[in-house]
């Protein structure tokens, strides 16, 4: 097992070397500039449109699509807001220092524009099944936009692998927390997860959308409130934590055994990878649900990507990072999963249990979203008949994740995420002029934009 872990770690270091980090940031910068800094210039409009207006029309499912914009956003957030927001942030801080948080913010800022572009493309390129239902995902804009059917199949297979790796992460997080805090056997956690996820799998997209619409807003608000309470009780430590975030991002002081520029690179790598794992910008996962949404213009759905990254990383991940920072627990030898939860308990013991409850909901809703993406990818690559026969295999991966070593689980997930990103980035690079044209059309059309500026 040690030799396997060493081999995978070597692959992971190469895959997530500076080249991929720079490509991701560079592409995010490209989409930010070519779309007129959409995440800044139109932020107020985007929040109103995606949160206020879409919530009011959350049950309006008239038009060309399968689910409403609000439900599509909740399904996507169900897949985004998970262990990465809690344990992923703790892992980044433990490995890259508090400076990793700064790079997480940088990745999120440019990731807003990148995710916006992915969703716009998912609305432009969609397919239909034999019954006329809309099909969406990165496979379609790669197949039709790049005229590369073979690459569409490749990313579908890689996406299946990525979702399986993500399943291991969420299952491992849940089992690790329950085992450490409540002595629940890891195998029992795995069995319970299989049963719960199986119930969702049997219900399909409609059931997933309804569950996500109910759970995601509640659990996100709940976690934010608990986190803010911890921060307020340690308010005097906040300025020092903010200072550490910015100074350690460029500090030459050794962190986690590193020296010089290596430390900065380490903080950058962990901040960007963990931030990306959480908000999924550039990964190609957002197009699955958003491509099925009912809208009048592709950009109307695209702007939800800005909101998702903001809520997921700038709000929820930042709260986790600051809580870990103000309590000082990141300097301990605890595992990331335990560290994140214990940081809440240092202020008031019951808060640890509340944070545990929130984390369990985060991870389970993420498992639901990942199953949906895996099923869509598998269907594209192997056909609906094969998918119907194997769709119940995904829940059984929970037992493997529950029993596997956490460091190995994150390494596997990093590799899978890096592999699936590459073909998606190729498509985003080639197709960015189409996104730019759609953006100009949307924000210059009074039908879509002018009436909402008032």
Q: Where on the chain are the PLM-derived regions?
A:
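Alpha-helical membrane segments and immediately flanking helix-loop junctions
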Residues: 58-93, 121-139, 143, 157, ...
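Membrane-interface loop-to-helix entry segments
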Residues: 23-30, 34-47, 172-178, 185-246, ...
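Helix-loop-helix module between adjacent transmembrane segments
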Residues: 30-32, 107-132, 138-201, 357-367
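N-terminal alpha-helical transmembrane segments of multi-pass membrane transport
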Residues: 1-79, 83, 94-100, 232, ...
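Flexible loop linkers connecting adjacent transmembrane helices
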Residues: 38-67, 91-98, 113-146, 330-346, ...
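Select transmembrane alpha-helical segments in multipass membrane proteins
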Residues: 21-27, 67-76, 147-161, 191-192, ...
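Extracellular/periplasmic helix-exit of transmembrane alpha-helices
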Residues: 116-126, 228-244, 252, 256-259, ...
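Transmembrane helix-loop junctions in multi-pass membrane proteins
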Residues: 3-4, 34-39, 84-89, 164-175, ...
């Amino acid at each position: 097992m040690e030799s396997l872990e060493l081999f995978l770690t070597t692959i992971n270091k190469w895959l997530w070397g500076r080249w991929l980090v720079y490509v991701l940031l560079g592409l995010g910068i490209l989409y930010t500039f070519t779309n007129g800094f959409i995440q800044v210039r139109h932020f107020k409009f985007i929040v109103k449109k995606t949160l206020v207006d879409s919530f009011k029309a959350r049950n309006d499912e008239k038009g060309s699509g399968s689910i409403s914009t609000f439900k599509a956003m909740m399904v996507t957030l169900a897949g985004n807001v998970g262990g990465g927001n809690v344990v992923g942030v703790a892992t980044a801080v433990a490995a890259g220092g508090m400076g990793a948080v700064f790079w997480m913010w940088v990745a999120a800022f440019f990731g807003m524009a990148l995710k916006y572009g992915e969703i716009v493309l998912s609305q432009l390129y969609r397919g239909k099944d034999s019954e006329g239902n809309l099909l969406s995902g990165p496979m379609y804009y790669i197949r039709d936009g790049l005229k590369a059917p073979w690459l569409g199949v490749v990313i579908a297979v890689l996406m299946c692998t990525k979702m399986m790796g993500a399943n291991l992460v969420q299952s491992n997080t849940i089992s690790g927390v329950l085992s450490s805090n409540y002595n629940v056997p890891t195998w029992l956690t795995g069995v319970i997860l299989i049963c719960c996820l199986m119930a969702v799998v049997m219900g399909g997209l409609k059931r997933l959308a309804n569950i996500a619409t109910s759970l995601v807003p509640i659990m996100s608000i709940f976690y934010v409130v608990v986190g803010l309470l911890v921060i307020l009780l340690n308010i005097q430590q906040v300025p020092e934590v903010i200072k550490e975030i910015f100074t350690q991002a460029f500090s030459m002081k050794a962190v986690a055994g590193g020296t010089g520029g290596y430390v900065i690179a380490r903080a950058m790598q962990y901040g960007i990878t963990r931030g990306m794992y959480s908000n999924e910008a550039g990964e190609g996962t957002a197009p699955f649900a958003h491509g099925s949404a009912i809208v009048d213009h592709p950009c109307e759905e695209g702007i939800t990507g800005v909101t998702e990254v903001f809520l997921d990383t700038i709000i929820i991940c930042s709260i986790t990072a600051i809580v870990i920072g103000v309590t000082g627990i990141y300097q301990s030898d605890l595992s990331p999963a335990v560290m994140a939860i214990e940081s809440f308990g240092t202020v008031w013991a019951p808060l640890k249990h509340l944070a545990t409850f929130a984390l369990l909901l985060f991870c389970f809703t993420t498992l639901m979203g990942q199953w949906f993406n895996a099923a869509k990818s598998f269907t594209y690559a192997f056909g609906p008949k094969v998918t119907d026969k194997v769709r119940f295999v995904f829940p059984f991966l929970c037992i493997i994740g529950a029993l596997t070593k956490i460091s190995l689980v994150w390494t596997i997930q990093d590799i899978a995420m890096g592999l699936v990103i590459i073909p998606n980035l190729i498509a985003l690079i080639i197709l960015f002029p189409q996104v730019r044209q759609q953006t100009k059309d949307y924000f210059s059309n009074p039908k879509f934009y002018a009436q909402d500026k008032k």
